[in-house]
Amino acid sequence: MSNSDLNIERINELAKKKKEVGLTQEEAKEQTALRKAYLESFRKGFKQQIENTKVIDPEGNDVTPEKIKEIQQKRDNKN
């Protein structure tokens, strides 16, 4: 299991416990930290995926949004 999978598993365990019996202060802090770390990781991965996407219409024209093209161009110029 990856670290992300373990974090999701623990987040789910804490969510279930919260519904059933409640969480201690320490568990609530852990839940908040795990959720924050998960969201940061998700957003980073999603951003990378979007920034590496090229949109082509049925006629074969590149219709990638200009904002994405600008980000890709800046990234490519750095390398």
Swiss-Prot record:
Pfam families, per database record: DUF896 (PF05979)
Subcellular location: Cytoplasm
Domain of life of the source: Bacteria
Gene3D superfamilies in the record: Helix hairpin bin (1.10.287.540)
Keywords for the protein's UniProt record, in alphabetical order: Cytoplasm
SUPFAM superfamilies in the cross-refs: YnzC-like
Family: Belongs to the UPF0291 family.
Name assigned to this protein: UPF0291 protein SAV1341
